[in-house]
């Protein structure tokens, strides 16, 4: 899907380890980060620019610093810190923008061991243009997000995933 966006001349900006995850495929710009704070600050910088496309961010501290290391206090503090940046991001959104927040897997900092955990992770979707709030049905994979983004940008979909665009109001 990132390649479809790029081929349609959209900006596809990766912040954090997005370039590593996707082997630099489909990105028009990539920025590495040191930590969550750096990632949030770089995201805010991009949001202040005039760009047309997708800004895809991975805040790795939730996983690497607090999840795998089983540090619930640090994890909680990281969520509180992110919440401050989220408020700033929300203020910069326009009526045309859609903000999606999700994790790629569970990593409960209170669970034994150091591996990923298997709980479901939320998908939060926000836009100033939405007129209603609600709860979406369970999303089964990132293919749902990919298909939804393809609909939002009117680009070719991949063969996987069902779009939930019609449920966003």
Model-derived features: positions:
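Feature captures the catalytic ectodomains and active-site-proximal regions of enzymes
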Residues: 1-169
């Amino acid at each position: 899907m990132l390649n479809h966006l790029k081929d349609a001349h959209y900006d596809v900006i990766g912040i954090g380890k997005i370039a590593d995850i996707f082997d630099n495929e489909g990105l028009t710009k990539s920025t590495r980060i040191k930590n969550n704070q750096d990632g949030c600050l770089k995201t805010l910088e991009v949001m202040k620019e005039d760009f047309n496309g997708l800004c895809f961010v991975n805040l790795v501290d939730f996983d690497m610093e607090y999840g795998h290391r089983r540090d619930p206090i640090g994890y909680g503090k990281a969520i509180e810190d992110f919440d401050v940046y989220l408020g700033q991001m929300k203020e910069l959104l326009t009526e045309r923008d859609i903000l999606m927040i999700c994790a790629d897997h569970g990593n409960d900092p209170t669970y034994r061991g150091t591996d990923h955990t298997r709980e479901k992770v939320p998908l939060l979707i926000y836009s100033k243009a939405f007129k209603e709030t609600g709860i979406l049905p369970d999303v089964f994979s990132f293919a749902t997000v990919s298909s939804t983004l393809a609909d939002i940008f009117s680009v070719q979909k991949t063969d996987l995933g069902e779009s939930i665009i019609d449920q966003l109001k």
